[in-house]
Amino acid sequence: MKLNDTIVALATPSGAGAIAIIRVSGPDALEIVAPLFKAKSKKDLAKQPTHTLHLGNVMDGERTIDEVLASVFRAPKSYTGEETVELSCHGSPYIQQEIIQLLIRKSCRSAEAGEFTLRAFLNAKMDLSQAEAVADLINSENAASHQMAMQQMRGGFSNEIQKLREELLNFASLIELELDFAEEDVEFANRDQFKDLVSKIQTVLKRLLDSFATGNVLKNGIPVAIVGEPNVGKSTLLNALLNEERAIVSEIAGTTRDTIEDEMSIGGVGFRFIDTAGIRETKDVVESIGIKKTFEKISQAQVVVYLVDSSQIAVNRERLQQVRIEIEKIKNKFPQKPLLIIANKTDRLADEEIHNLKTKLEEISSHAERAQFLLLSAKTNLGVEELKEKLLEYVNTGALRNSDTIVTNSRHYAALLKALEEINKVEEGLNADLSGDLLAIDIRQALHHFGEITGEITNDDLLGNIFANFCIGK
């Protein structure tokens, strides 16, 4: 990949639309575009100042391809830090390709995936973690993932890491200075102050590492397994939550024979609802496979919703005992997972039956760790909104509300983990009163891992892997 040539790509999604934006960036962007652009104002595009907008036609010789708006961004005041022109044309795929092919014939090169953002990183318009946040922002599908991506893109995470790195670097410099005066036995770095700094860095790193569990699921959607005996209304509940029919709904027990998954946003947080096969004892081979998959999905879920038919357990003691057994199975396998027991089809019950049902469910849930119950009718939507509220209670959204830094990227998590390991070694060295040359080894390694996050320490393979996940026009 040559990074000193001029590149072009479609910056908007491919396909037909009202408008499309074609981005050109590089040292010759204006020199290439200007001769092809006939401004209504008769002005020369190559001589226009930055952040100006111009109406005109893109010309291929004497042929007009389209009437466009040309946006001029002069280096370094552009997204990439280079000379940049963006052509807003009509969204016909034919027009898009005609303009792009014309620019390529005039010596532009087709941009590779993520190359515009790569150039922005290399031109110091953003650091590496901010560049990765651009991809997260593009892929965000709910308020939570959007907020986390925006916070990271604005430099919240980078600033926190950079501050730690600078403070550690100051002490590292003093330690290194001691090595230059080893014969004089001079101590420039106050060891007590250094211990305080190490303790502070450990606290921050542990907080960031702890945030990854929340950040990762918020970014990708909270998985919720909807399980229970066959034909209790799991598919109907899923459809009520999603406001559309996705699962097969039937009066025949066991018709949901595989897992069905869909996504929705509740209170700005993404949830992935997984409707699974029941977990009753069965000799049916196909249904047995579905039951095995149910437990696999429960293991992957953050929250378990166990659905029962209220009209059955309200009058049938044997069925109620079966429910107890099934709940025990789930809690024995997954004692720490939040479990919400939902009595569905309450629209079929009289008031006295509902009262008795509440008493029974209170007794069952009290014997199961981290369990609650809820009365609901998926058919009439009674209790569906309360279910959504309870699901939000299970999610740690406090960090989001407080705008705390939340780690969502597994690469960042790995680098933070390695940095903490090195900082722990520094602490051990300080407590053991090790010499500065030995402390310096671990300090340098910690600084290296901080630099990996922001891109101050990097390599071509790492950059290739990161930016290959971007769309072409970004």
Swiss-Prot record:
Protein's cellular compartments: Cytoplasm
Residues binding GTP: 231-236, 250-256, 275-278
Listed Gene3D superfamilies: P-loop containing nucleotide triphosphate hydrolases, Probable tRNA modification gtpase trme, domain 1, tRNA modification GTPase MnmE domain 2
Superkingdom as given in the UniProt entry: Bacteria
Keyword set, alphabetical order: Cytoplasm, GTP-binding, Hydrolase, Magnesium, Metal-binding, Nucleotide-binding, Potassium, tRNA processing
Binding sites annotated in the UniProt record for Mg(2+): S235, T256
Name the record gives this protein: tRNA modification GTPase MnmE
Species lineage: Bacteria, Pseudomonadati, Bacteroidota, Flavobacteriia, Flavobacteriales
The encoding gene: mnmE
